[in-house]
Each structure stands twice: as structure tokens, then as C-alpha cells.
């Protein structure tokens, strides 16, 4: 994490003159991996997570996250995929995309994951069961069967009819880039995760 160059500094610097003060900040953005918020007792603390965890409003003044919770003006549902490299226009076009005839000429299915840490076992089970039917190309570090991890995930997904797009867990609201990326390149996601509309 670069405190001088990140999504929040880029967004806020459009309207405000930012001063990054590591000693006495007015505002502190932190996450589940941050343990230094207690160093700033007078700062307004804003929690942001890309993980499946709920903000603790005993510690956070404000929060952004995945979950569908109502905490007045102190919480905004802001899924992590909104920070990824897509433009807002890309996301707006998702609802109007449909399967195209070029799917017929594509490879069968892919699976791109780096590890199985904190992942529900259903993801691995699905990969192995589907692989019994037909080879599923694994382009990540986990179960790689194509000669090494892919460098450009979206370019890789584009060559497939289907993408296994399983979240690490199934919780209402928890939606990551895993379902968005295949849709952007017109690969059909086989999705497991958030049961609500994302």
C-alpha cells in the first residue's frame, strides 16, 4: 500500500489539496491488515476492506465495505471490484452484454486462482469435478496446468467459453472482481458467492 498514491488519494486530490501527514493526520484510512490506528487517537478513522469482514464501528468512525448494512451516514457499500482497473463505463455495459456466437470457437473453461487460503472447499471440489468431464485450464499458481501463471488475466479469460468465478466465501454482499472480469471479456462466469444482486 502506497500512502501517497492509491485510490483514495487520487480520488480526493481531484477536489482537495492533500497533505500526507504520518505524524498527526486528520483522517486515517485503514483496513483489516492495519494495526497502527491507535497511534492516531484524534484522527477520524475510515475503515475500508477488500476482505469478507464487517467493520467494527467501535473503532471506525466511517467505513466502506461489501456488506449490506445500514449504519446511517457512517457506512457505504463499496465492493472492491470498483477499485479495479475497469472504467465506470465498462461496468455500466455489463447489463447489456449477451453471449455471442464467437463462444462456439473458444476453449472450454478456465480457473485462475493463486492459493486456497481462506477459500471454501467447494471451489476446489468444483474444479476437480468439472475437470473429470473435460480439461479445465488453470492459469493461476494454484493447480496450474498450462506451464505457468498467466501475465494478463483478462486476456487469458477472453479465450474461454466459461470461467470458474467462485468467491472465497458465500456471504450476501461479498462480490469481488472474480465475477466482473469474465463478464467484461464475454466469458460466461460459473459463479458461486454473493446470493444477492451485486
Where are these regions (language model features)?
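Nucleotide-sugar donor-binding catalytic core of glycosyltransferases
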Residues: 1-198
Amino acid at each position: 500500500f502506497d500512502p501517497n498514491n492509491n485510490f483514495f488519494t487520487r480520488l480526493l486530490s481531484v477536489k482537495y489539496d492533500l497533505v500526507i501527514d504520518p505524524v498527526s493526520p486528520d483522517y486515517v484510512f485503514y483496513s483489516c491488515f492495519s494495526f497502527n490506528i491507535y497511534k492516531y487517537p484524534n484522527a477520524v478513522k475510515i475503515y475500508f476492506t477488500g476482505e469478507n469482514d464487517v467493520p467494527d464501528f467501535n473503532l471506525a468512525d466511517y467505513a466502506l465495505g461489501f456488506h449490506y448494512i445500514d449504519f446511517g451516514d457512517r457506512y457505504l457499500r463499496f465492493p472492491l471490484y470498483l477499485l479495479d482497473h475497469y472504467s465506470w463505463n465498462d461496468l455500466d455495459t455489463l447489463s447489456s452484454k449477451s453471449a455471442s456466437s464467437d463462444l462456439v470457437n473458444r476453449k472450454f473453461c478456465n480457473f485462475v486462482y493463486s492459493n486456497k487460503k481462506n477459500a471454501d472447499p467447494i471451489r476446489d471440489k468444483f474444479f476437480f469435478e468439472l475437470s473429470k468431464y473435460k480439461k479445465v485450464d488453470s492459469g493461476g499458481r494454484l493447480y496450474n496446468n498450462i506451464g505457468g501463471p498467466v501475465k494478463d488475466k483478462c486476456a487469458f479469460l477472453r479465450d474461454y467459453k466459461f470461467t470458474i468465478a467462485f468467491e472465497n466465501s458465500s456471504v450476501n454482499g461479498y462480490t469481488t472482481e472474480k465475477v466482473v472480469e469474465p463478464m467484461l471479456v464475454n466469458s460466461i462466469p460459473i459463479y458461486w458467492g454473493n446470493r444477492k444482486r451485486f
